[in-house]
């Protein structure tokens, strides 16, 4: 895979030996610069990737370089080699671990795919009415924290100050969350043997759904390589682990955001690129048609409303993401302006819809957002279409049911 632009290698010393392997992998040319000239070189060289050796002399130049890189478009990956301290928000950590070039090549290729995806979205945006979400992707990210050691509570708080957190005290619980949620990273903390850690990482590497997922291990030395391009060992205090894991998490969240935006473009702008569900306008149109057709042809139609604390907008977004992943292809829904999420279950009676809504609600309750541990506990109301209903009357009854349930 060749990239549209050179690789800018920033260092005050000699090139590490494993950098030569980039040529063999068709990741070239590599342009060298020192730290004092790095920010200017970004403008002049227009690189596709910035690779920086954190081997000394970088301290006064790191923040200006990170800011310059963040200003570039499309996305410019910034990989920091063997960083000892806390990194800027857009610097992807990479520990060379004895010069394993295969890991670096896989990391760069994964980042370059996201750069290409961003360029594709930017190219297609002018043709549509879709806009990229303006929020920092990290604000919408959700991370699975797996662990049961003494550092688990502090790590949960440190991550929770930056992203949404789903906690798991066992590998079995972690596997369940991996299968039911859209996650932007996994942090594997202490509390498991090296053998269990190895088995968990092996399973992740063998499943194509999780291969690009950032995986941060905090407690064990990694004795072998895994087919996980974004696997990183980050030991240390919880605050440092969270800060240095965040760039990898943000990159994955951005990739997911770009993928949803591309699907929205393909759907003519009727999908919300932030939630993955229909826009409010598209939902109103499709719901009116579904009610009309069900009344004319017969059959069942049920609706569920998941209402959240208006002060916890993140809970609504998490619920929308869960629903977009788990609901059937024939169902549809939208995040509403009042903070709720409404889902329509086609060809479904009240009893079945109530059972589905209860299961979906149980999945939503496992996320905490922010340092105050606000949890996603929805107030759920379910109703079904009757022969005398219109789309408006059914939604009105659903909202009234929710108000009574909340009072």
Question: Would you name each region that the model predicts?
Answer:
Residues 350-361, 377, 383-407:
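Catalytic-core segments of nucleotide cyclases and related cyclic-nucleotide turnover enzymes
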Residues 90-91, 98-129, 238-264, 286, ...:
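Receiver (REC) domain switch/output surface
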Residues 260-282:
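Amphipathic HAMP/coiled-coil signal-transducing linker helices
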Residues 278-299, 318-328:
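Short regulatory alpha-helical coupling segments
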Residues 9-31, 148-171:
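Two-component/phosphorelay signaling modules centered on CheY-like receiver
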Residues 142-143, 273, 277, 299-310, ...:
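Active-site-flanking beta-strand signature of metal-NTP-handling nucleotidyl enzymes
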Residues 15, 33-39, 48-75, 83-84, ...:
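Conserved phosphotransfer microenvironments
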Residues 270, 318-353, 362, 366-373:
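Conserved helix-loop-beta segment at the catalytic/binding core of cyclic-nucleotide signaling proteins
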């Amino acid at each position: 895979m060749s990239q549209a632009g050179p690789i800018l290698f920033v260092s005050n010393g000699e090139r590490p030996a494993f950098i030569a392997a980039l040529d063999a992998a068709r990741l070239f040319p590599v342009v060298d610069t020192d730290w004092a000239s790095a920010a200017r070189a970004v403008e002049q060289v227009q690189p596709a990737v910035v690779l920086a050796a954190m081997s000394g002399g970088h301290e006064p130049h790191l923040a200006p370089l990170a800011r310059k890189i963040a200003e570039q478009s499309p996305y410019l990956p910034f990989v920091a080699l063997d960083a000892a301290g806390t990194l800027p928000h857009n610097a992807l950590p990479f520990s060379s671990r004895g010069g394993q070039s295969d890991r670096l090549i896989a990391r760069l290729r994964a980042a370059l795919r996201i750069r290409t995806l961003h360029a594709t979205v930017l190219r297609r945006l002018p043709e549509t009415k879709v806009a990229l979400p303006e929020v920092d992707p990290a604000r919408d990210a959700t991370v699975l924290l797996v662990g049961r050691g003494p550092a688990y509570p502090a790590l949960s708080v440190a991550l929770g100050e930056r992203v949404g957190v789903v906690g798991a005290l066992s590998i079995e619980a972690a596997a369940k969350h991996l299968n039911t949620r859209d996650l932007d990273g996994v942090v594997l903390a202490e509390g498991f043997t090296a053998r269990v850690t190895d088995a968990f990482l092996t399973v992740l590497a063998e499943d194509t759904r999780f291969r690009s997922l950032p995986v941060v291990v905090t407690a064990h030395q990694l004795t072998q390589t895994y087919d996980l391009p974004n696997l990183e060992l980050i030991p240390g205090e919880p605050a440092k682990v969270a800060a240095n894991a965040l760039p990898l998490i943000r990159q994955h969240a951005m990739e997911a955001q770009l993928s949803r935006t591309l699907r929205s473009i393909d759907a003519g702008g009727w999908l919300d690129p932030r939630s993955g569900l229909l826009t409010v306008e598209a939902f109103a149109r499709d719901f009116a048609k579904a009610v009309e057709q069900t009344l004319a042809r017969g059959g069942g139609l049920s609706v569920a409303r998941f209402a959240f604390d208006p002060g916890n907008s993140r809970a609504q977004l998490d619920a929308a993401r869960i629903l977009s992943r788990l609901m059937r292809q024939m169902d549809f829904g939208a995040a509403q302006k009042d903070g709720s999420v409404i889902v329509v279950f086609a060809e479904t009676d009240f009893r079945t819809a109530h059972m589905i809504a209860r299961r979906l609600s149980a999945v939503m309750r496992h996320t905490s957002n922010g340092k105050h541990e606000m949890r996603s506990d929805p107030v759920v109301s379910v109703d079904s279409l009757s022969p005398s209903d219109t789309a408006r009357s059914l939604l009105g009854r659903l909202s009234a049911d929710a108000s009574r349930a909340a009072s």
